[in-house]
């Protein structure tokens, strides 16, 4: 290319409103290109990645960094591969339940504060950096879950699939016993299925959460609910 033609095209290129320039494949930009970029105060970045890989990685990175986010009070655990957000008033037993779940082989994401980002319709929960791997248990204090139960007991992030809200048991409350009530919690515009768990002495809440996780997984694989099974059995008996 002739020198005058090249200079003219480079100047025209930089006449547009450009935030920055990224050169991939480790290519070396022409000195005239750099000179014109300095004149217009435009950043020129380089990467050894091929263009398609760079675009893919950059898109994922920006989707995470620019995603809408919020922080909720609660505990996030990974139970049988299902991300469960445990909510409820302070002192009701969220952290103690999480500790029991960890002892049973499940994993902690975060305790007390849950940072949540909405990425492409998914809710991704993580822990604030200062409390990663930490669990606060009343009467004991703060414990390092990683040190006590190993690296596999903590996971960095998890998609929230289910919300389990703890509340004190009330005899005058008609709690759902058939699993037919549909409750949802809105988080950053995404509706997440919500289960109300009444808490009182003697109830093994950790086992209940395990059952809820397995039941949720079952509901994803099957269109037939336990209520449907019971109705089918009743119809079969009535036909005899």
Residue ranges and their predicted role:
Residues 110-166:
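Conserved nucleotide-sensing/catalytic segment adjacent to the nucleotide-binding pocket
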Residues 61-81:
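P-loop NTPase nucleotide-binding/switch module
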Residues 47-65:
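Short, structured interface segments
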Residues 161-240:
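Conserved NTP phosphate-binding and transfer environment spanning the P-loop NTPase/kinase superfamily
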Residues 81-109:
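Glycine-rich phosphate-binding P-loop
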Residues 25-28, 48-52, 113-114, 121:
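Short, ordered loop/turn segments at secondary-structure junctions
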Residues 1-38, 43-47:
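Extracellular/luminal Protease-associated
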């Amino acid at each position: 290319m002739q020198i005058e033609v090249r200079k003219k095209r480079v100047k025209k290129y930089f006449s547009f409103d450009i935030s920055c320039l990224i050169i991939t494949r480790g290519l070396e930009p022409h000195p005239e290109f750099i000179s014109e970029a300095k004149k217009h105060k435009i950043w020129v970045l380089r990467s050894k990645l091929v263009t398609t890989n760079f675009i893919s990685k950059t898109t994922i990175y920006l989707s995470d960094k620019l995603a809408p986010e919020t922080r909720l009070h609660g505990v996030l655990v990974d139970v049988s591969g299902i991300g469960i957000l445990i909510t409820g008033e302070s002192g009701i037993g969220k952290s103690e339940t999480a500790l029991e779940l960890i002892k049973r082989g499940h994993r902690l994401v975060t305790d007390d504060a849950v940072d949540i980002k909405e990425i492409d319709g998914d809710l991704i929960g993580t822990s604030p950096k200062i409390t990663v791997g930490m669990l606060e248990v009343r009467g004991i204090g703060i414990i390092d879950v990683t040190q006590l139960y190993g690296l596999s007991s903590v996971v960095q992030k998890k998609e929230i699939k289910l919300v389990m809200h703890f509340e004190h048991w009330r005899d005058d409350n008609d709690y759902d016993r058939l699993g037919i009530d549909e409750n949802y919690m809105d988080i950053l515009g995404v509706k997440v299925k919500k289960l109300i768990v009444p808490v009182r002495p003697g109830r093994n809440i950790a086992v209940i959460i395990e059952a809820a996780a397995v039941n949720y997984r079952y509901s994803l694989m099957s269109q037939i609910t336990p209520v449907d099974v019971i109705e089918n059995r009743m119809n079969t008996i009535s036909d005899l």
